[in-house]
Amino acid sequence: MTLIDHLPNDADPDALFEAFSGWAEQQGISLYPAQEEALIEVVSGANLILSTPTGSGKSLVAAGAHFTALANDQVTFYTAPIKALVSEKFFDLCKLFGTENVGMLTGDASVNADAPVICCTAEVLASIALRDGKDADIGQVVMDEFHFYAEPDRGWAWQIPLLELPQAQFILMSATLGDMSRFEEDLTRRTGKPTSVVRSATRPVPLSYEYRTTALTETLTELLETRQSPVYIVHFTQAAAVERAQALMSINMCTRAEKDEIAQLIGNFRFTTKFGRNLSRYVRHGIGVHHAGMLPKYRRLVEKLAQAGLLKVICGTDTLGVGVNVPIRTVLFTALTKYDGTRVRTLRAREFHQIAGRAGRAGFDTAGFVVGQAPEHVVENEKALAKAGDDPKKRRKVVRKKAPEGFVNWGENTFEKLIASDPEPLNSRFRVTHTMLLSVIARPGNAFEAMRKLLEDNHESRKNQLRHIRRAIAIYRSLVDGGIVERLAEPDAEGRIVRLTVDLQQDFALNQPLSTFALAAFDLLDPESPSYALDMVSVVESTLDDPRQILAAQQNKARGEAVAQMKADGVEYEERMERLMDVEYPKPLEELLFHAYGLYRKSHPWVGDHPLSPKSVIRDMYERAMTFTEFTSFYELARTEGIVLRYLASAFKALDHTVPDDLKSEDFEDIIAWLGEMVRQVDSSLLDEWEQLANPEVETAEQAAERADQVRPVTANARAFRVLVRNAMFRRVELAALDKVEELGEMDAESGWDVDAWGDAMDAYWDEYDELGTGPDARGPKLLQIEEDAAHGLWKVRQTFADPNGDHDWGISAEVDLAASDEEGRAVVRVTDVGQL
């Protein structure tokens, strides 16, 4: 029986509480006092602010809230900050209430949208609240991880529903809420329902705290010896986490039997990248690494090993994600300060408690441990003093090591203050956008009154409210000037005194607001141009969010190459530095796109919320004929390869969905096939997750993740594999054109074509010709011949050089090993000859 089968005939609060607590008892769950108190408030119809520690069963209270809403024939919404958590909760609630009663809205996907229980992101709920307001069919809202209300970029989405859905019962939940009296009063005033705050500092697994002045390796060794593992070591940069993992390889973490168990669980898992090969060494030693820059499949493997109790230490960052299920007994802080993008500062109490709260696993541990590590210079000074012993003379002679220049100090007092401090109050992040005005204007009724209430009755200070009002007036005027909004002489049948002149459903996209601009910009391109397909890629890339790490790496590379060239040209230092300021990352079609964007914005003012950003990541990778590994190595992005992959997956989805089928040329289809297959071979989980969100009835999130680790043969997608082969061959042409025989020799040494062989072959070519073409014609299909020899599992390939005379009598001959390609997830090309036909 599912939970929904326990719904009582009578929606009386007592009957509801008895029914739900009875179901919990059948599941072997004993309610904590805070859970009981919270559920009593929920079934009575009150708003609830639930602030209890991590692992104290907030999810059970949320289930009780949905149960109550269903009993009262209400639509209930559950919101979470990330799509992955929304998806996870969707499947959890399907088990409790049945698939027919649960739906999901993420912006990417809409599943069973008319169900009485809806899981969605905060932004989706905010969009509904702006569009429908008090008329929205929403009787209850459960907002998980409510501390995101204070997030600078996204916090507005947690505030809007509170302002615009007075008909709803609200359940706000987080482990780190701080003073919520303002919200308590505000919710009661707006909804007319009493608001209860349920707090509990009592953790199911109590925490103990300790500040250490020993060296980190000594601290860690003691924690391992006293069975306080697994230990999560908190770092404040991804690089520091990886460096720590490498440094800890000298400590013997596991027994031989434990290492065998790790190897067995890893099985045939494929570590395909440079970082992956390092991670393989770490995890086999009992050390995990976990941060946002990793490939999802590597993070999943670390989580899987941790859940099996096989990792003794996990080196990670302070951004241990929401919904990440990593069991931890001890949290060890390497520092109590962090760089926040502007300055180095002491951790905030909320940040500290959010991480410290992960220590101790309910149902597994009887206690959790939080350790604060003293700064390195303090540790060294303590060590020197200990060596001096009790001899006053020796102690006076100790030369104390000073803190590094610019060091923001912390100490035991800092640690104790953070432990004792409550999380800071949540600050409002309200903002006004074109989207907000368009949504409010589109709803029935007087839009001016609705906007005035929204702008003057929110959680902002009066000073900020006036700033938002000025912004709203400016946006409204731009909408009128652009012909998007018109004033009506008389109210229409639904009470509107202003109306939209465009169809929002056609011209406005929640997830890809610039997709309509991309469609318009395609008309500016020349279909006959040899660069047409790549120009379409550049249009779509300009509408995507900037992957800052990639763009910074591209700029650094471009500046390094520019400096080398200027030095070779004898340019003086001062002039070099001046010229260097103009060197940026590649921005194809920049002038054309910005001109088109300016014109488009006049008739579509709302795109002003989303600035255009020309860039070349997909195009750069394709033009250089690089594999994923070659690209991350070339730009030194191995530590952030997860960010690279996320951008590639996002670009693939945008290219596949934004470009109409009638505009997709053969070359463009090749690029999409190549990109999709490359992403899948590196880590298919991002695309699988997207497809699974769109078709959740096919498989669960767990099944999709399991399938993601089962890599399909790269040769299965024939079109994509041909592009991979073509790129592998043309990569050699590009390197040959630059006379980079060392790289070619490194690439082909195993097939007998080392640096000397390549050098001799290219010397012979340069004796005959002074150029080697690498333009669009040089990589065209006319200069590549593929002969498929399926019987022997080989493709025989000939890449002809584009020589300046058009003789086309030089080239590269190679064999492609299909079985080896499937094994390695890439085109395995073995050069057999370089020379004249």
What are these regions (language model features)?
Residues 212-236, 243, 300-308:
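Conserved interdomain hinge at the start of the Helicase C-terminal
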